[in-house]
């Protein structure tokens, strides 16, 4: 997308933040209008995260106008909202490449720009990192300032409060900006969000802090702060002791779409010492009516026609694994009211929307709190219920201690439905599900299942749900199934693989949904093909039988080779003193960058041609 200067005359004058700061303050509202339109025009043509960025246009402009970035540090929590930041920091003409192979990274990324001071992607990390930078800046004593922008969803996570508690003790010069739009990805839940709603619907406090008076002095009354109430607030609202008890000087709420007021407030706050907290009210999807009306659907979008206001409908086709999981969940809950489903703020992505509506008493969205989700499930299991934790592979990393300490050691029957296992695609390094097999495999008594299609996925969910000997995990990918017919649910024999094809000399041991590619390769080279199904317990008898009958073995998985399922096969063969060549195929020892799933599989030789090529190169050594 080429930049049209005539269409965006003010934005054309601000291709860098240095140019932005040369603009007269009075031109900033026009700049914001053009920036918002440019974001709409570019994302509609290229796809990407959308509604979050629309909501922070004025805040982004104001922060870069006031703060001396990149000398001053500006941190965006999660990063979904950082497209305007990228546009203003020299990447305007490349914004159409975002989330594409070799394009701009979907999140702030240190290797991409000096303005991106922290790699992000997971939530609630900004205040901890920002505090560390602020303490370092204090020791440096050069006047460097640090500001963190965190959403009302991300701030509910425990890590954010741990950081604020420490910040209040350190007294470092740190600004935390709460971008409060009452929307994370799913609707926010929990007492903190309810508290903020109460603040906004209550009467203005008469007691104002002196610093607050100075910061807001000269500003017009706040307009249009209408959340869960039809009352208009005027002046400044102070939320009890919520943030001040943590040692912060609280200012706000202020209108996040009044760029001139934001500039005024931020200029005053930049001069204040110690931890500062600015509460900014914004509207997710601001300026584009369809996104304002339905910010969840417009959170991340494919290419679309802005004039129509409609997102393209997904082509009717094979069901996604997330949908298969959601259907199984509802089917099981209908027959068993002891089922309790737990998700850390990923209802839509995990396929749980229908379940949450049909079985509200068996559904728990614990917000962005993966650690709590897992230990909460442990408590449900102790109480005699049957918890199912629906969680993305990349987010399960955040609850590893709870998985071991609170679930596995106690051998509690908790089922983990691990979505987005393997290559996820455009969101890149922070979201690929490469490590789950490796970090789960070393946990004693953990059952790990890797379905090859949607029917096996259902059978494995059923198997794990009825397994009472300890925790179990079913790990399935992002994307659609293969069209396999769905059979009646039944428990699979624990730790048993299935031979799919008999061949000669070589056997391919497949773990997971690369089975179609493995089948194509097995046909081409006349290899035995096995659907191993279980990473743990491993079908040791079958592996040893295959080793005795073949000259070499190939293990195949869409996950980290180091510590993965193939490593389990290697360990068994070494322990049994079976000397046979083994090639482990999977993801290498590196973080996987953005791209489509097909592009990444091709690049890492995990499509059929690549697998066959890896085998041929190995045999030729």
Swiss-Prot record:
Annotated binding of Mg(2+), by residue: 152, 181
Claim: Magnesium is one of the keywords in the record: yes
SUPFAM superfamilies: Thiamin diphosphate-binding fold (THDP-binding), TK C-terminal domain-like
Amino-acid positions noted as binding thiamine diphosphate in the UniProt annotation, renumbered to this chain: 80, 121-123, 153-154, 181, 288, 370
Keyword Transferase set for record: yes
Family annotation (Pfam families): DXP_synthase_N (PF13292), Transket_pyr (PF02779), Transketolase_C (PF02780)
Cofactor names: Mg(2+); thiamine diphosphate
EC number annotated for this UniProt entry: 2.2.1.7
InterPro entries to which the protein is assigned, alphabetical: Dxylulose-5-P_synthase (IPR005477), THDP-binding (IPR029061), Transketo_C/PFOR_II (IPR009014), Transketolase-like_Pyr-bd (IPR005475), Transketolase_BS (IPR020826), Transketolase_C (IPR033248), Transketolase_CS (IPR049557)
Catalytic activity of the protein: D-glyceraldehyde 3-phosphate + pyruvate + H(+) = 1-deoxy-D-xylulose 5-phosphate + CO2
BP terms from Gene Ontology: 1-deoxy-D-xylulose 5-phosphate biosynthetic process; isopentenyl diphosphate biosynthetic process, methylerythritol 4-phosphate pathway; terpenoid biosynthetic process; thiamine biosynthetic process
Keywords assigned: Isoprene biosynthesis, Magnesium, Metal-binding, Thiamine biosynthesis, Thiamine pyrophosphate, Transferase
GO cellular component: cytosol
Gene3D superfamilies: 3.40.50.920, 3.40.50.970
Record SMART domains: Transket_pyr (SM00861)
Function comment: Catalyzes the acyloin condensation reaction between C atoms 2 and 3 of pyruvate and glyceraldehyde 3-phosphate to yield 1-deoxy-D-xylulose-5-phosphate (DXP).
Family: Belongs to the transketolase family. DXPS subfamily.
Stated name of the protein: 1-deoxy-D-xylulose-5-phosphate synthase
Origin organism lineage: Bacteria, Pseudomonadati, Pseudomonadota, Gammaproteobacteria, Enterobacterales
């Amino acid at each position: 997308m080429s930049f049209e200067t005539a269409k965006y005359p003010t934005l054309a004058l601000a291709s860098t933040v240095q140019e932005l700061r040369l603009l007269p303050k009075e031109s900033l509202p026009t700049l914001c209008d053009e920036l918002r339109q440019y974001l709409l025009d570019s994302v509609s043509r290229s796809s990407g995260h959308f509604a979050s960025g629309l909501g922070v246009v004025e805040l982004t402009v104001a922060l870069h106008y006031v703060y001396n970035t990149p000398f001053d540090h500006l941190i965006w929590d999660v990063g979904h909202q950082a497209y305007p930041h990228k546009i203003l920091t020299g990447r305007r003409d490349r914004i159409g490449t975002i989330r594409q192979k070799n394009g701009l990274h979907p999140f702030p990324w240190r290797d991409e720009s000096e303005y991106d001071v922290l790699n992000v992607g997971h939530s609630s990390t900004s205040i901890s990192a920002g505090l560390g930078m602020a303490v370092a800046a204090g020791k440096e004593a050069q006047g460097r300032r640090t500001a963190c922008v965190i959403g009302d969803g991300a701030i509910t996570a425990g890590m954010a409060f741990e950081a604020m508690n420490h910040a209040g003790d350190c007294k470092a010069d740190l600004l935390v900006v709460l971008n409060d739009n009452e929307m994370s990805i799913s609707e926010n839940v929990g007492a903190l969000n309810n508290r903020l709603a109460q603040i906004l619907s209550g009467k203005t406090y008469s007691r104002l802090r002196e610093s607050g008076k100075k910061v807001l002095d000269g500003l017009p009354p706040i307009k249009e702060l209408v959340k869960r109430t039809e009352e208009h607030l005027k002046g400044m609202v102070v939320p009890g002791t919520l943030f001040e008890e943590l040692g912060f000087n609280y200012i706000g709420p202020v209108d996040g779409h009044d760029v001139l007021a934001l500039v005024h407030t931020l200029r005053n706050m930049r001069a204040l010492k110690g931890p500062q907290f600015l509460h900014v009210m914004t509207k997710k999807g601001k300026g584009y009516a369809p996104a304002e009306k339905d910010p969840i659907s417009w959170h991340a979008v494919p290419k679309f026609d802005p004039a129509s206001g409609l997102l393209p409908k997904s082509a009717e086709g094979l069901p996604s694994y997330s949908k298969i999981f959601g259907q199984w969940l509802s089917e099981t809950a209908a027959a068993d009211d002891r089922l309790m489903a737990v998700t850390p703020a990923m209802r839509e992505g995990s396929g749980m929307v229908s379940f949450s509506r049909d079985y509200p008493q068996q559904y728990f969205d614990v917000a962005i709190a993966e650690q709590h989700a897992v230990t909460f499930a442990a408590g449900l299991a102790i109480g005699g219920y049957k918890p199912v934790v629906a969680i993305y592979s990349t987010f399960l990393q955040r609850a590893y201690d709870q998985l071991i300490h609170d679930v596995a050691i106690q051998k509690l029957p908790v089922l983990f439905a691990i979505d987005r296992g393997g290559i996820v695609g455009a969101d890149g390094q922070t979201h690929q599900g490469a490590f789950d097999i490796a970090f789960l495999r070393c946990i004693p008594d953990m059952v790990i299942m890797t379905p090859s299609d949607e029917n096996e996925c259902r059978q494995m969910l059923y198997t794990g749900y009825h397994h009472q000997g300890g925790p179990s995990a079913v790990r399935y990918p992002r994307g659609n199934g293969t069209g396999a017919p769905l059979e009646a649910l039944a428990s699979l024999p624990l730790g048993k693989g299935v031979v799919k094809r008999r061949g000669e000399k070589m056997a391919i041991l497949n773990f997971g949904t690369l089975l179609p590619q493995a089948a194509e390769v097995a046909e081409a080279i006349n290899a035995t093909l096995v659907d191993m199904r279980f990473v743990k317990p491993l079908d040791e008898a079958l592996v040893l039988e295959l080793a005795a009958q073949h000259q070499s073995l190939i293990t195949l998985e869409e996950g980290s080779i180091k510590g993965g399922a193939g490593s389990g096969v290697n360990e068994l063969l070494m322990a049994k003193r079976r000397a046979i060549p083994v090639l482990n195929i999977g993801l290498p020892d590196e973080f996987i960058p953005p791209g489509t799933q097909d592009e990444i599989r091709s690049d890492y030789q995990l499509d059929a041609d690549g697998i066959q090529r890896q085998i041929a190169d190995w045999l030729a050594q």
